[in-house]
C-alpha cells in the first residue's frame, strides 16, 4: 500500500524542489519515499515548480501554513489588519487574538461588511494564512501544558464553620426549601439575590511584559478579583459590588473608591467580609424600615452567624440550582468589563504606548463598577422570572390550573345558563301553540318560527361544542408550555443530565427511540382494550363511573404533594424519586397530547 495522500504547504513543496535540484543523480522514487509522498505528487510538484516558488516568496513566513492560493472572502479586510499587526509588532508590542478580533470588527465596520463576525474559526484561518505564529502559539502551548481538571465535587449540605459560629442559629432557613416558596410574602423590591464571581485584571500587563514565560510556556494571569454582586428581584436596586483581592487596599482618590474593597491572602470574599457586608445591609434596611430576603448562591459553602440580623433574612439555594444572576447577569458584567479593557488596550496599541497597557487596581475597580451599572434592570428581572420568581415556572403551574372551588363555580354558572335556556324554550313553545290555534296564516308563521328556533338551538349546541374543544386544547397547550419551560430552564425534564436520562429505562421507553414500532403496537392494543372497556361499561348499567382527572387537576394535585413532601428534611433518594415522577408525568402528557392532536387531525380529514 502506497503512502497516504496529504496536502503539503508551500514551504514543504519548496524543500522537495530543493532536494531534487541538489541531488540530480538521485532517483525520483527514492526522493518520494524520503518525503513519504506518492511519485505522482512529486511529478506534479516539479511540474508546477515556478508557481510554487513564487508563492513561497509571496507569503514569506506564512508559507509554512498556507497550502493553496485561495483568497479569503474578506481579503481586503485581512490586508488592512495584517498591515496594522505588522506595524504594532515592529514597535515591539505583542498582540493577543482577542485584540485582533476587536480590530477586525472595527475595520469591517469602516468597510461596511455587515456580515463579518470575527469568529474563532476565521481568526484561526487568518493566523494560518498570514503566519501569525506568535498568537496561535499561546493556544498550542496552553493545550500542551494544561492538565485535565478534576471533576467537581458534588455540592452537599456541609458548610465550612466560621469563627464564633455555633452550629445552627436562629433565622436560618434550610437548604431543602425552594427559593420561590421562601420568597412568598415579600414584595419584589424586597427579594435580593447575591452571587460571587471572578475577574482578572492583569490581562493588559501580561501583554506588556510578553505572553511567554522563561520556560517557553504561556503565562497565565495571576491577579484575580472576587466580586460579590447583589440585586433585587425587579432590578430597581443594585447594591455596590464587594470586591476582594490579594493586593493591599489602594489609596482612595479624591472621589473615593467606586466600590467596597477588601484584601486577604487568597483573594476571595471571606466569611468576615461577608458578615460585615450583611451587617451594613441590615443597618440600611433598618433605617428604611424594610425587611428583606437575601438568597445566597455560591455563598452557601460559608457558615454565618445571622443572629444579629433583624431586617435581613438569609436563605440558601438548593444544591444544583442555577442562581438567578447566573442566568445572564454575571455574563453581562464580564462582557462589559472585558470590553472596557479591550478599549484601553486598543488605544495603547494604536498610540504605541507600552505604559498604557498597564492596568492598576483602582482602574480595575472603576471598570467593575461601570460594568455593573451597565446591566439593565429589565435584564435582572428577566433572569429572576426564568429562575421561577414571579411569572416563572412556579407561577405558570399555580395560575394555569384552576382550583376545585373555581371549577365548581364554573359548573354552577353553566347549569344556571342551561336552566335559563330551557325556560326560554318552554315559553317559546307555549307561544307556538297559541299561534297554531289561531290557524291559517298563524300556522305558517308558527312553522317558520319553529324552523328558526331549531336552527338557533343547533347553532348554540355547535358553539358549546367548540368552546369545550377550545378549553381542552388550551389546557393541553398550557401543559405543553409548562413542559417546554422546564426543558428550557434546566436543559432537561426535572433537571436531569444526559447520563441520568440514559440510566432511566422508563424515560427511554417514553421517549420512543429504537422501540418506536413496539410503541405503535402497544398503542393499538391499548386502543382495543379501551374499546372493550367502553362496551363493558355500557353493558353494566349498575356500575359506578370513575371520573378521569384532567392534566391540570393531576398536576395541581402533584404540586400539592410535592410541596408537602419537600417541607420536610428528606434525603437525596426521596428527592430523586419525586423528580423521576415529575419527569414521567411530563413525558406521558406530551405523548398523550401528540396522540390527541393526531386523532383530531384525522377527524378533520375524514
UniProtKB/Swiss-Prot annotation:
Residue numbers spanned by region Disordered: 138-184, 392-480, 504-549
Biased composition (Acidic residues): 405-480, 512-545
Domain HTH CENPB-type: 65-136
Ranges of biased composition (kind: Low complexity): 144-163
Disulfide bonds: none
Record-linked SMART domains: CENPB
Domain HTH psq-type: 2-52
Listed SUPFAM superfamilies: Dimerisation domain of CENP-B, Homeodomain-like
Keyword check for Signal: no
Covalent link location (Glycyl lysine isopeptide (Lys-Gly) (interchain with G-Cter in SUMO2)): 246
GO cellular component, one term: nucleus
Post-translational modification: Poly-ADP-ribosylated by PARP1. N-terminally methylated by METTL11A/NTM1. Alpha-N-methylation is stimulated in response to extracellular stimuli, including increased cell density and heat shock, and seems to facilitate binding to CENP-B boxes. Chromatin-bound CENP-B is primarily trimethylated.
Phosphoserine found at: 165
PTM sites of type N,N,N-trimethylglycine: 2
Location of the region described as Homodimerization in the Swiss-Prot/TrEMBL record: 543-606
InterPro entries: CenpB_C, CenT-Element_Derived, DDE_SF_endonuclease_dom, Dimerisation_CENP-B_sf, Homeodomain-like_sf, HTH_CenpB_DNA-bd_dom, HTH_Psq
Keywords: ADP-ribosylation, Centromere, Chromosome, DNA-binding, Isopeptide bond, Methylation, Nucleus, Phosphoprotein, Ubl conjugation
Location of Phosphothreonine modifications: 396, 398
Subunit structure, as described in the record: Antiparallel homodimer. Interacts with CENPT. Identified in a centromere complex containing histones H2A, H2B and H4, and at least CENPA, CENPB, CENPC, CENPT, CENPN, HJURP, SUPT16H, SSRP1 and RSF1.
Role noted for this protein: Interacts with centromeric heterochromatin in chromosomes and binds to a specific 17 bp subset of alphoid satellite DNA, called the CENP-B box. May organize arrays of centromere satellite DNA into a higher-order structure which then directs centromere formation and kinetochore assembly in mammalian chromosomes.
Protein's name in the database: Major centromere autoantigen B
Organism: Cricetulus griseus (Chinese hamster)
